[in-house]
Swiss-Prot record:
The keyword Ligase belongs to this UniProt entry's keyword annotation: no
GO MF, one annotated term: NADH:ubiquinone reductase (non-electrogenic) activity
Membrane spanning residue stretches: 4-24, 28-48, 60-80
Gene3D superfamilies assigned to the protein according to its UniProt record, in alphabetical order: 1.10.287.3510
Domain of life the protein comes from: Bacteria
Taxonomic path: Bacteria, Pseudomonadati, Pseudomonadota, Alphaproteobacteria, Hyphomicrobiales
Natural source organism: Rhizobium etli (strain ATCC 51251 / DSM 11541 / JCM 21823 / NBRC 15573 / CFN 42)
Localization, UniProt: Cell inner membrane
Entry protein name: NADH-quinone oxidoreductase subunit K 2
UniProt subunit comment: NDH-1 is composed of 14 different subunits. Subunits NuoA, H, J, K, L, M, N constitute the membrane sector of the complex.
Amino acid sequence: MVPLWWYIVLGVVLFVIGAAGVLIRRNILVVLMSLELLLNSVNINFIAFGHYYDDFRGQIFAIFVIAITAAEVAVALGILVALVRNKSTLKVDDVTMMKG
């Protein structure tokens, strides 16, 4: 059986990589993928702690996070497509103002 701390280390490493991607990268699509990596690292920790303590709440929280992430991706990709049509760029720095 894999020890709990391996899952925690994996979650922390993925979280740091995702946070670095959100803070450093300038491409909106890469920032969105880094945000997904952040949320999936949290899911790994939820499931690991839920399994370690024989509790299903970790899995339930992970399912909720996956559902919220799916909705977030749908909205973000819609905004991204509209942005590419209007501004013809995916760089965060080029998009300074959005009109309603």
